[in-house]
Amino acid sequence: SFLSCREQDGAQLLSRITQKEVKCVLDPTLLLSAKEWGKYCEFEIPKEPYILVYFLGEKSEHRRAVEKIQKLTNWKIISLPAAYLEMENNDYKKVWGGPKEFLSLIRGAALICTDSFHGTMFSINFQRNFFSFCKSSDSEESSENSRLYSALNIFGLSNRIIHNMDNLTAEDISIDYKNVIPILEEQRRD
């Protein structure tokens, strides 16, 4: 029998419990290419650059981080309201929708700010600039952060997790995907 897990910590735990090798594998959302997911992107998106905000949690410091990024870029903010955080300025738009809107907005965003694991994975798949935020503290028993850390470490993108906004500059926004894509393709083959 074959055992696999989406995160390194989980794979190690299962391996200790079962005394079997447990392989760390890609999240299923990454098994399809951006082109394949693109078939579902039928929602019309804005022409000008925008920051897509998709937060499942309700941390006010995340809101403040997005506002700082918005000031650095002057890009409009579009929010997919899961647990919507009201922005202090009026330079945003809420968008309600389903999977097509979600995928279209991620694919078209200049930058994604999210605390969603899958928001992060789709950002990588569509080769978008993104910042990931942790929904909970690493010390919380219900923390899901290890899954995010594990995935970002595989792609060499652990620097995309925002812990401290103090030194963030506009140059920190861009991601060079030239080293990420070969890793993603190799992981798909595995």
Where are these regions (language model features)?
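Active-site anion-handling motifs in enzyme catalytic cores
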Residues: S1-D190
